[in-house]
Amino acid sequence: MPRQFPLEKTRNIGIMAHIDAGKTTTTERILFYTGKVYKMGEVHEGTATMDWMEQEQERGITITSAATTCEWRGHRINIIDTPGHVDFTVEVERSLRVLDGAIAVFCAKGGVEPQSETVWRQADKYRVPRIAYVNKMDIMGANFFNVIEMMKERLGANPVAIQVPIGKEDTFKGVVDLLTMKAIIYVDDLGKVSQETEIPDEVKDIAEEYRIKLLEAVAETDEEIMMKYLEGEEITVEELKAAIRKATINMQMTPVLCGSSYRNKGVQPLLDAVVDYLPSPVDIAAVKGFSPDTGEEIERKTSEDEPFCALAFKIMSDPYVGKLTFLRVYSGVLQAGSYVYNSTKNKKERVGRLLQMHANHREDIDAVYAGDICAAIGLSNTTTGDTLCDENHPIILESMEFPEPVIQVAIEPKTKADQEKMGIALQRLAEEDPTFKISTNHETGQTLIAGMGELHLEIIVDRMKREFKVEVNVGKPQVAYKETIKKSVKVEGKYIRQSGGRGQYGHVWLELEPLERGGGYEFVNKIVGGVIPKEFIPSVDAGVQEAMQSGVLAGYPVVDVRVTLFDGSYHEVDSSDMAFRIAAAQAFREGMKKAEPVLLEPIMKVEVVVPEEYMGDVMGDINARRGRIEGMELRGNAQVIRAYVPLAEMFGYATDLRSKTQGRGTYTMQFDHYEEVPKNIADKILEMKNK
C-alpha cells in the first residue's frame, strides 16, 4: 500500500500545557472537528478519548501520551498527547523528542504557570517550533494580552498575535483574524457554524494595533516583506502566511491564537494554523546518529529512499495484544511482519503487526513510512529510547536522558498469591517508564519502588491493582538520598585466595575523585604496558559500579565520582574476572571511607501561590523547612514565592499549606538538583538509618 499522505502534508505535533489549561479538551475538540469522534468527551465527566487509562479518567489528568491520527484539509496530523503534571516530565521529554512541532496551550487567566515554563524549556532543548493557543477565553479573569506579556517575560519567547479576541469572559464570541482582517463569529453551540463578518467597532482599534505589530514582527524576519511594508505596498495573505511559517519553523516567533475549547470556539482556526505554520517532517533537519561500529556521525534524511531507522519512544502494555512499542520512523519504510535490527541492544527482532492508533480504536496497517508515527507489536527486547534500523545500515540515534527518581516507598504484597504476580507487574511497569526504578533493601529484604513524586508512585500502585490485580501494602515515602565524596584519594585493592587447585588473584590501584553535582560516574582506564590485561578492565569497572550501589555511610547509591584505574598486577593462571571485580569493589569501599564521604539530598524547586495576607506565615514556614527563597512576584492579586526546599522537608506540605492559608494557597514542586546535607541533619539521618 503506497503512502496515503505525502510527507509535506504530514504533521507530527504535541499538545503541551500546564495542568488544567484545557489540553485534553482541546485535543478532544480537534478529534471531533476532524471527524474522528462523533460525540465529544468531557474531562470532568471522565469520558475524554485521549485519557484512556482508568485512573486518568478518575483524576481528570493525562498521564500517558497516547498517539492519535486525524485528518484536516488533506493533511495527516499525528497528535502525541503529553501530560501536564510535574511528576510526569519524563513523558513530556519523551514525546518532544519525536515531534516536529507543538501547540502550547495556556489558560487565559493563569497564563504562564510553573509547569508551562518547564515544558517550554524542554521544547527549547529539542528545538521544537510551536504555536500558542490561549484557551478558556470565556472564564472570569480571562486576559489574552496579559498572557502574551507573560510569555515574553517568563519564557523569553517572541509571541506574535495572529488573532485578537472579540469580547471576553461570558461575552467572548469569536476572534479577529489579523491576516485577513475579518471577524470570525461563532453562531451555534457546537462551534461548527461560524460567520465571517467585518470587524465589530468595539475591537477595531485593538485589531489595527495588533495588525501593525504582526506586520512589524514578520518584517523583522523577512526582507521582502520589510521592503513592501516600508514602501506601503499591499502584502497578500499568502505572502504573510509563508513568512510566518518560515519564522515559526526557524524558532524566530511563536504565533498566538485564542479560543475556548470547552465552548467550541476557535478550534478550527487552530487546526488551520497547525497546517499553515507547523513544520512537516521535510522541514526538519536530518536526524543525526552514530555508527555502532566506528562511532562516526551519520545523518538520515526524512525520505523513503534512505535506509530504515526509527526511535522507540514509548512502551505500553495492552491487555489485548501485550506489549505495544510506539515508533517514530525517521527514514525508509518498515513492512509489517519483517525483521528489524535493534542497534542499541545489538539484537534482531521481528515486527508482528503495525497499528495506526486512533484515540479509542486502532487499525492494522501494512507498512509505515519515513515521518510516520505508529505502534508495533512483537518487539520483545526493545525498550524506550532504543533505535531500530536496517541491519545492513546500522545507526544509533541519540537516546533520551531521563532524570533519576527522587522519592521511594517500600511495598510488600498482601498475600502469597500477590507476591508472585508483583514481580511481573513491577517489571512490566518499569519497562514502560524509565524514571520508575525497583530495588531491594538487602538488610530488610523489602522491595523499594522509586519515582518522580508521590503522585507518580500512587499511580504505579494503582495500576498494579487494576491492570495486574496485585494488592500491596505501601510504606511511608522516603527520600532517595545519595552518597558522594569530597576529596581525592588513591587506594589499593587486593583479592588473593590460594588453597589447593586454582587460586584467585586480582590486584588494582584506583584513584577516586569527586565530580561536580550531576556528574554521575566516570571510569578512566590509565593502565599502560599491560600490567592488567585488557580483558579484565571491564571487570574492574563492573566491580566499582557494584560497590557504588551501596555507599559506606548508610548504604545509599554513590554518585558524582570519577574512578581511575592506574596500576595493579595480575597472575598468569589465577587471575579471573571475578577476582578483579572483588578487588575493585574492596578498593572502592576502602577509598570511599578515606575520601570524606557525605550525604546528598534531592532539592525541589517549589513555587507557592498565596494571597498577600498569608505571605509572612508561608515564608516563615519555608524557612523553617530549610528552604532558600529565590524570589517573589505579584501574579494578579496573589503573591508567588519561588524557593528551593529539600524534599525531606516537603512531606505533608499540602495539608500544612491548606491550613495556613485556609485552603487558598497552592503549590507545585519538581526535582531540581542534589545538594550536600548539612552535618547536623546528616548525623540524625545516619543515626536513624543505622539503628
Swiss-Prot record:
Disulfide bridge partners, by residue number: none
UniProt cross-references to CDD domains, sorted A to Z: EF-G, EFG_III, EFG_mtEFG1_IV, EFG_mtEFG_C, EFG_mtEFG_II
Residue positions binding GTP: 17-24, 81-85, 135-138
GO biological process, one term: ribosome disassembly
Every tr-type G domain range: 8-282
Highest taxon listed in the record's lineage: Bacteria
InterPro entries according to UniProt: EFG_II, EFG_III, EFG_III/V, EFG_IV, EFG_V, EFG_V-like, EFTu-like_2, G_TR_CS
UniProt xrefs under SMART domains: EFG_C, EFG_IV
Any single Pfam family the record assigns to this protein: EFG_IV
A molecular-function term among this protein's GO annotations: translation elongation factor activity
Subcellular location: Cytoplasm
Keywords annotated in UniProt: Cytoplasm, Elongation factor, GTP-binding, Nucleotide-binding, Protein biosynthesis
Record's function text: Catalyzes the GTP-dependent ribosomal translocation step during translation elongation. During this step, the ribosome changes from the pre-translocational (PRE) to the post-translocational (POST) state as the newly formed A-site-bound peptidyl-tRNA and P-site-bound deacylated tRNA move to the P and E sites, respectively. Catalyzes the coordinated movement of the two tRNA molecules, the mRNA and conformational changes in the ribosome.
Family according to the record: Belongs to the TRAFAC class translation factor GTPase superfamily. Classic translation factor GTPase family. EF-G/EF-2 subfamily.
Protein name from the UniProt record: Elongation factor G
Organism: Caldicellulosiruptor saccharolyticus (strain ATCC 43494 / DSM 8903 / Tp8T 6331)
